[in-house]
A protein has these predicted regions:
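Auxiliary Fe-S-binding modules of radical SAM enzymes
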Residues: 1-214
Length: 214
């Protein structure tokens, strides 16, 4: 399927100067293929459909890191996310650590026991699963979670647990990461009170499909 899409992309770009047809990030993840280069996303016109979210995140992290001078301050963080996004978050943290060599980090893949293990998106992870899988485990100084784990505009998970409930259970401050790469970098490096706050409902859209968006 992806090869057919790529053939049509080449044809459309040659004839009309736009690739027009795209596969969501999930297709590339499930196929074990690299995401397309940034130019093939035509300016990210279909982010709301899960097309290019992870490539854009990678680009935003790279640019955000380039703007910073770097330091050797010790930092220790844990990121909790879904199975699909975990490898890409790991790559983003590797980029950050190139300028911040004393950054210690771990990406923990949260298994979805609440809705079923076939659900691998972060947007359907509940507070209960976070609490059960992070408790009694060595964690960083703070735990980062993507904002799409929470109900829109609230600090409440789908199972009605609050961020404070989970934070108290695991004994760590929880930092909510908004859906852009700059905020991920800020969440990793900056004091929480100085963290840049943004809101963009694009990265890792909540999905009820068996595998879902990244």
């Amino acid at each position: 399927v992806l090869e057919q899409i790529h053939r049509w992309q080449r044809k459309m770009y040659k004839e009309h100067g736009i690739h027009f047809i795209h596969a969501s990030d999930e297709w590339y993840i499930l196929a074990g293929l690299e995401l397309p280069e940034e130019e093939r996303y035509d300016g990210y016109l279909q982010l709301e459909n899960g097309v290019g979210m992870l490539r854009l995140l990678d680009t935003e992290v790279r640019l955000a890191v380039e703007k910073r001078t770097g330091d050797e301050k010790p930092r220790s963080i844990t990121v909790a996310t879904g199975k699909l996004a975990a490898p890409y978050i790991e790559k983003c943290l590797e980029k950050i650590s190139t300028k911040y060599p004393n950054l210690e980090y771990e990406v923990i893949t949260i298994r979805n026991n609440f809705f079923g293990e076939k659900i691998t998106v972060s947007g359907l992870i509940t507070g209960t699963d976070l609490k059960e899988q992070l408790s009694n485990r060595k964690l960083g100084e703070r735990v980062l979670i993507p904002c799409n784990m929470l109900r829109s505009g609230e600090n409440v998970f789908l199972d009605d647990l609050t961020v404070d409930d989970v934070s108290k259970a695991i004994g760590r401050e929880i930092v909510i990461v908004e859906e852009d790469g700059e905020d991920l970098v800020s969440s990793v490096l900056d004091p929480v009170q100085n963290k840049k706050q943004t809101r963009r409902q694009m990265y890792e859209q909540t999905s009820s499909s068996n595998s879902g968006q990244a």
